[in-house]
């Protein structure tokens, strides 16, 4: 069983997950939709290589964020509202599945953070996850921007 879970983790960590010809899930806050790289605006999810500590064990929290997004999207194609481009020329957007914000879902689930440097929109959702020790808030972690060094 542990071997199968390890294989699944490696699969999710190393491949862009594609459910349709026009959707690939890159990580917890980035998708490619119709060939366009979209970074979810206002949030920051852990990097794929990022780990957290829970009960003295390393947890692949970056992979967990991606898996959570994969499960949430399911076989749906997100609808995204563009907010412009970032310095890396990615489209910044808020994306929805069944009229639910994927950004809000990830932050309330504790696997993304309100990216206060750029937006205040998801602060209450982050406070909800933090106060209820949901997701990464139940672990010891580094914020993604600290992990990346920026």
What residues fall within each predicted segment?
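Small beta-barrel nucleic-acid-binding modules, primarily SNase/OB-fold domains
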Residues: 2-6, 11-150
């Amino acid at each position: 069983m542990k071997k199968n879970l390890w294989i699944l983790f490696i699969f999710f960590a190393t491949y862009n997950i594609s459910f349709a010809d026009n959707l690939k899930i890159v990580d917890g806050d980035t998708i490619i939709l119709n060939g366009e790289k979209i970074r979810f605006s206002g949030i920051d999810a852990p990097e794929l290589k990022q780990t957290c500590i829970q009960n003295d064990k390393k947890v692949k929290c970056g992979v967990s964020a991606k898996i959570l997004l994969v499960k949430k999207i399911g076989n749906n194609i997100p609808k995204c509202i563009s907010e412009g481009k970032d310095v890396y020329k990615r489209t910044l957007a808020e994306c929805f599945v069944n009229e639910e914000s994927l950004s809000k879902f990830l932050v309330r689930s504790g696997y993304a953070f309100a990216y206060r440097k750029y937006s205040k929109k998801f602060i209450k959702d982050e406070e909800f996850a933090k106060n209820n020790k949901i997701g990464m808030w139940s672990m010891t972690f580094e914020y993604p921007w600290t992990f990346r060094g920026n």
